[in-house]
Regions:
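Long helical/loop segments within the catalytic core of UDP-sugar-dependent glycosyltransferases
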Residues: 2-79, 91, 120, 124, ...
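Active-site-adjacent bridging/hinge elements
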Residues: 34-37, 59-69, 102, 145-152, ...
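Short active-site alpha-helical segment characteristic of glycosyltransferases
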Residues: 82, 86
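Catalytic donor-sugar/metal-binding loop of nucleotide-sugar-dependent glycosyltransferases
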Residues: 87-107
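Active-site donor/metal-binding and catalytic loop motifs
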Residues: 100-120
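Long, K/E/R/D-enriched contiguous segments that form extended
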Residues: 113-194
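Membrane-proximal soluble regions of multi-pass membrane proteins
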Residues: 126, 130-142, 147, 235-270
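Membrane-embedded multi-pass helical conduit in multi-pass membrane proteins
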Residues: 164-260
Length: 270
């Protein structure tokens, strides 16, 4: 009720659980959800930008759901990420979402808690569905929806947020190129190749990128600490390469499955 007092739909954080805090696969879900639900979604809500729902821990005003009623039920049966699409469709109809961050009387964060995959193959399979559904099928199904009649700045912000949602494939390519460059550079030095002197502009760009990397790791650790304590925050830094590798594996699988779908294979949950 508190969340819906000033918004059309509300979301509480989702906190993934792991059997052991140091779990590399299950733990990376917690790192990503903490950053998303404590940083990104509150910012989107504050900017009145398109805000997806998580499928659990969310509530809606009836009149907001009626605005997007098509007579075929609230969720599309042929969608891989029906919860994500619901939030985007609501935002495009003019509905406003909010991220509700509150603590109970015991001091614990009010959140939806659940276990996530702890094996690499299971994580890649699940995140393939997310990436394909948001970045590829979602583009086909939804296009780039924004609330009609909203100010230009609000529409541009919503389009930017949609791009952020769909940039996973581009991020995977950049990550793969970066890791390949690191491996090749180390191999070249190990084989006795002399270090190259970089142009000042290139050197400055690399230092800037390194600073941004530290900034991103610090933010991830900060928000993971909020959900899992200091130890969880430190582990979030160490697990960043795990997140990156899973993204690269997921991107390849999402592209493969999407191409198969374009050639006629029926859409199905894997």
């Amino acid at each position: 009720a508190r969340g819906l007092a000033a918004a059309d739909f509300a979301q509480i954080p989702v906190i993934p659980l792991a059997r052991q805090q140091w779990s590399w696969i299950a733990g990376h879900y917690g790192d990503e959800f903490a950053e998303s639900h404590f940083k990104e979604l509150p910012v989107r809500a504050a900017l009145v930008a398109a805000m997806p729902t998580a499928g659990v821990g969310c509530a809606f005003r009836i009149d907001a759901l009626r605005r997007i009623d098509t007579g075929h039920g609230p969720f599309a049966a042929d969608s891989l990420v029906e919860d994500y699409e619901l939030g985007i469709r609501l935002a495009a109809s003019g509905a406003r979402g909010t991220m509700l961050l509150a603590r109970g009387t015991d001091g614990r964060l009010v959140a939806s808690r659940a276990y996530f995959p702890h094996r690499l193959d299971s994580a890649v399979r699940q995140k393939t569905r997310w990436l394909r559904g948001i970045a590829l099928e979602g583009w086909d199904r939804l296009g780039w929806p924004v609330a009609q009649g909203s100010p230009l700045a609000a529409r541009l912000i919503s389009l930017w947020m949609l791009w952020r949602d769909r940039r996973g494939l581009v991020s995977a390519i950049v990550i793969l190129a970066g890791y390949s460059a690191i491996v090749l550079g180390i191999a070249a030095l190990a084989m006795g190749a002399p270090p190259r002197i970089l142009a000042p502009a290139i050197a400055a760009l690399l230092w800037f990128n390194l600073a941004m990397l530290f900034w991103r790791l610090a933010l991830r650790a900060l928000f993971a600490r909020r959900a899992y304590g200091t130890g969880g925050g430190l582990l979030a830094i160490l697990r960043q390469p795990v997140s990156n590798i899973i993204l690269v594996m997921t991107a390849w699988r999402a592209l493969r499955d999407y191409w198969a779908g374009r050639r006629g294979r029926a859409l199905h949950w894997d």
